[in-house]
């Protein structure tokens, strides 16, 4: 009997600090906003050319407006906000591996939950009972985010950017139906861990529709012109680029697998992807020297970077599809142009649908 009493006592002690460590609220968009958000992905497909470890699908950029407040740490300390990716990694599939790309880094769900510092810090609500002078006299500046008693932050608003992806563990059979459905890609919480309480006010972002994965007996091949995949703008002066933008063209040719085993019809969506800073509603990439890059379609309309749109439709008898693009560089309004060589990298990515 004594033994069981001691076990219960130790169990309670272990959980008492946890309530303090998880003293942080995060919402979608604004204070008191939703703490559960759901996004449904469109059906996608696995090409027959997929190999173990390949990414066979990824989402568009998911930009989540996050508002965090109510740091109730009893010791008056500030609290850092963390994005806990793959917070509930238990969901698994024999053939598919889920993961999250956050700030350009991939986090497979097999690695378990990962905490990522959002570089956002919130001061304790309790410290506001003291004046800045009293905080300084007690030597509590180090408990503050800014270390300045006159600069207290009780809430933060920021945008978190990430992508969900699916990799192939091993090639599934043609008629395979995945059990994957709802998946929480991120939860915003404190550094102490994720709050799983029923009354938790910690924003979770769900993706559902992952069970709509189709397995194809087909694939496509790509050929980019120029073959070296380098768009060279040559040499030009500061004056030249100020007078007018510079353009170069390139094309992408797509060929459907023509083997006798290919019987499925499918569509292909594409995205021009970059980790660089974007502007103009993500339609222009800042090169970093006072210039910007846009990619234009046949109607001279700019593409949105990091967003998938329909590229080619192979549901008919079409076997070859070629599309022409224009790369345009121009000045950034109000920016100083720095002369010298420059380069930027853009990836052409596809999803099968």
Q: Each predicted region: which residue ranges?
A:
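Mature extracellular/passenger domains of Gram-negative fimbrial/pilin and adhesin proteins
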Residues: 22-353
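Bacterial N-terminal signal peptides
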Residues: 8-17
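Bacterial N-terminal signal peptides that target proteins for export
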Residues: 1-8
